[in-house]
A protein has these predicted regions:
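Alpha-helix C-terminal capping segments
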Residues: 9, 45-49, 56-58, 64-65, ...
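Active-site rim helix/loop that mediates acceptor-substrate recognition in acyltransferases
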Residues: 1-10, 111-138
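Acyl-donor-binding surface of acyltransferase catalytic domains
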Residues: 31-88, 205-210
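Conserved active-site alpha-helix within GNAT-family acetyltransferase domains
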Residues: 61-72, 164, 186-204
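Conserved hydrophobic beta-strand within the GNAT/NAT acetyltransferase core sheet
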Residues: 58, 152, 179-183
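Short amphipathic alpha-helix that is part of the acyltransferase structural core
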Residues: 1, 84-116
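Conserved donor-binding loop and adjoining core beta-sheet/short helix segment
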Residues: 1-45, 137-159
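Conserved acetyl-CoA-binding loop-helix of GNAT-fold acetyltransferases
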Residues: 36-48, 159-175, 191-196
């Protein structure tokens, strides 16, 4: 199922993320511009329901504050030099290991708010970009991640209690002085981990509300 980066009606312009519907039944709506947001939101809602959405979340307009709050997306940053070093090893995902990486990712992310399911197409894109990694220590798999430039886009522990090591390994693989990441405000355990490593909250990227 394809997304609609520009979903336009006579009542407004927005974005619809529908690719999660086959896996989780979830759709996301972002209101970009509307002079009649209530009417436009209802159009987005009905469209998402027609294509099979069972849970719908929306962001982008103050009208949404009348709905139940779901989560915020928080940006955090840290100085790379402030993150503890680790002797764990980092290995890029290959065409032989992408299947296992994807399996771990989908298992660990299935209960994380606003995390996307990794489809075959998304896994292929990851492999082409070359920014997916396994983190090992003493021959044991600790976790996986996605990192490039100055960003960490995914952290998932495989072995319980190894989140700090996974984050440290990914951070020190980056060629930058600062590292940034984004996390759902409801993922309190991850936020505590990042703060313990020296990350600070720098921005609230978006707020999401449950509209269906």
């Amino acid at each position: 199922m394809r997304d609609f980066p520009m979903f336009t009606t006579e009542n407004g312009v927005g974005s619809l993320v529908l690719k999660e519907i086959p896996y989780s039944g979830i759709a996301y709506v972002t209101i970009r511009d509307s002079s009649v947001p209530k009417e436009f939101l209802n159009e987005c809602l009905e469209f998402c329901k027609v294509v099979g959405a069972q849970h719908i979340y929306a962001s982008g307009h103050e009208i949404l504050t009348s709905y139940p709050f779901h989560t915020s997306v928080i940006r955090m940053s840290a100085a790379v030099d402030a993150i503890p070093q680790t002797d764990a090893s980092i290995f890029p995902v290959t065409d032989k290991t992408i299947g296992r990486w994807r399996e771990i990712y989908n298992d660990r992310m299935k209960c994380v708010d606003n995390a996307a399911f990794m489809s075959d197409a998304a896994a292929s894109d990851l492999l082409k970009r070359g920014d997916g990694y396994f983190i090992h220590k003493d021959g044991e798999l600790l976790g996986i991640g996605i990192a490039s430039d100055d960003r960490i886009d995914c952290v998932a522990s495989y072995k319980p209690g190894c989140g700090r090591t996974v984050v440290s390994a990914l951070t020190h693989a980056l060629m930058s002085e600062q590292v940034i990441l984004e996390v759902a405000s409801t993922n309190e355990r991850a936020i505590r981990l990042y703060e313990s490593l020296g990350f600070i909250k720098t921005a609230e990227i978006s707020k999401w509300y449950k509209i269906f």
